A protein has these predicted regions:
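Juxtamembrane helix-break-helix junctions at the cytosolic face
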Residues: 63-81
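Core segments of alpha-helical transmembrane spans in multipass integral membrane proteins
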Residues: 19, 23-25, 46-68, 85-91
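Membrane-helix boundary connector in multi-pass membrane proteins
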Residues: 92-112
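Hydrophobic transmembrane helix segments
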Residues: 2, 16-48
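Small-residue-rich segments of transmembrane alpha-helices in multi-pass membrane proteins
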Residues: 47-50, 106-123
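Juxtamembrane boundary at the C-terminal end of a transmembrane helix
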Residues: 125-136
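Physicochemical signature of membrane-embedded alpha-helices that form the seven-helix bundle of GPCRs
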Residues: 9-16, 48-55, 78-85, 112
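Hydrophobic alpha-helical membrane segments
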Residues: 56, 79-97, 117-124
Length: 136
């Protein structure tokens, strides 16, 4: 299994990113009211949060499936690039919000911004370190 993942570092970073994705899956699918109260979104935002969760949950399912595949991440470049692009978009939007370019009245959370940067870094490291495997 370690050989399929190109080393122990990749095998540590990948589950960390999946745990983070799992956390957001739980929040968006099973506990949207936590996000409603954290960001003062209002009760009418619950359906749209669950719609976001309907995109996050399949991503998590595919990510867990990749862990247990016989060939590991072999040929799964689109999954890794997708995760990188989603995280990058989150970071760009959070910077835009923090700089009052996008939605200047919204409530921001520094913790979410840090997590976004961590996810971008993990995704970039995994793409770089697994490039000969995921693009095979």
């Amino acid at each position: 299994m370690i050989e399929a993942w190109g080393g122990i570092l990749n095998l540590v970073l990948y589950p960390i990113s999946m745990l983070g994705l799992g956390y957001y899956t739980v929040l968006t699918v099973f506990s949207p009211n936590t996000l409603v109260s954290r960001y003062d979104l209002g009760e009418k935002s619950v359906p749209i949060i669950r719609i976001v969760g309907s995109f996050v949950l399949p991503t998590l399912i595919i990510g867990v499936w990749i862990i247990f595949r016989e060939n590991g991440p072999l040929g799964c470049w689109i999954f890794f690039v997708f995760n990188f692009l989603v995280s990058l978009c989150q970071v760009i939007l959070s910077w835009g919000t923090r700089l009052k370019i996008i939605d200047p009245d919204s409530k921001t959370d520094v913790g979410d911004e840090v997590v976004g940067h961590v996810f971008v870094a993990i995704a970039a490291i995994l793409i770089f370190r697994l490039s000969d495997t995921i693009y095979a």
